[in-house]
Regions:
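Extreme N-terminal, non-catalytic leader segments
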Residues: 1-28
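P-loop (Walker A) phosphate-binding loop of NTP-binding proteins
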Residues: 33
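Conserved lysine of the Walker
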Residues: 38
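Hydrophobic positions on the alpha1 helix immediately C-terminal to the Walker A/P-loop
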Residues: 41
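Short beta-strand-centered segment that lines the nucleotide-binding/catalytic pocket of NTP-utilizing
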Residues: 51-65
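Conserved nucleotide-sensing/catalytic segment adjacent to the nucleotide-binding pocket
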Residues: 66-110, 121
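Small-molecule kinase domains that catalyze NTP-dependent phosphoryl transfer to phosphate-bearing small molecules
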Residues: 109, 113, 131, 161-199
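ATP-dependent NMP and nucleoside kinases share a basic, alpha-helical "lid"
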Residues: 109-158
């Protein structure tokens, strides 16, 4: 079972691990419920550890033409996790430079190539970052969660008029993924961000 941890404790844990100068980069994967603060925590950690790179699962959506029929009902079917693993996560885990092109759903196109130098800390953040396809390229898995009421409040503030569609479409897919792969139960640590000011 995972242990509960607060962000300051996670920072201390990472600092201690990096102080040992491991031979391979430390890859921290932040998964969890939408609205739980994955991106916020990733940004906090990136500021705390400048010698790091951050990878976002949101950069690895599949173009609509490549998605399987019925993808809207299948968790993760709109993601290209194999490309994330092969082009970004595995090279970063092996201490190699990373080069990849993010796919922008807003623009409907791949963006210019992004090049990242090898760093001792790699932060992978976003939904599906604990997916079994990525097993073997991660050192530490942290699951973020918050109370349902707080999640609703945050998503309403974030999504505005798009909230109803977001809640009906994406939240069930995400919860299905958590249940199918026991994501919360198999994490190393859990961060509960329900209380304001947690991250």
């Amino acid at each position: 079972m995972p242990q509960n941890i607060a962000p300051p404790g996670l920072i201390s844990l990472l600092a201690a691990a990096l102080a040992q100068q491991p031979t391979k980069p430390l890859v921290l994967a932040l998964d969890g419920r939408c609205g739980s603060g994955k991106t916020t925590l990733a940004n906090t950690l990136a500021r705390q550890f400048p010698a790091s790179i951050t990878l976002h699962t949101d950069d690895f959506y599949q173009p609509p033409a490549q998605r399987i029929r019925g993808w809207e009902k299948t968790p993760c079917a709109n993601m290209d996790l194999a490309r994330l693993r092969d082009e970004a996560l595995r090279p970063a885990y092996e201490g190699q430079p990373v080069q990849y092109r993010a796919y922008s759903c807003r623009e409907g196109a791949y963006l210019p190539a992004r090049e990242l130098a090898a760093q001792p800390l790699v932060i992978l953040e976003g939904s599906y970052s604990h997916h079994p396809l990525l097993t073997g390229c991660e050192t530490l898995r942290v699951f973020l969660t918050c109370a349902k009421e707080e999640q609703t409040r945050r998503l309403q503030a974030r999504e505005g008029e798009r909230y109803a569609n977001f809640a009906a479409r994406w939240v069930p897919l995400e919860e299905g993924y958590f249940a199918q792969y026991h994501i919360a139960e198999t994490a190393d640590f859990v961060v509960d961000t329900t209380q304001s000011g947690t991250i």
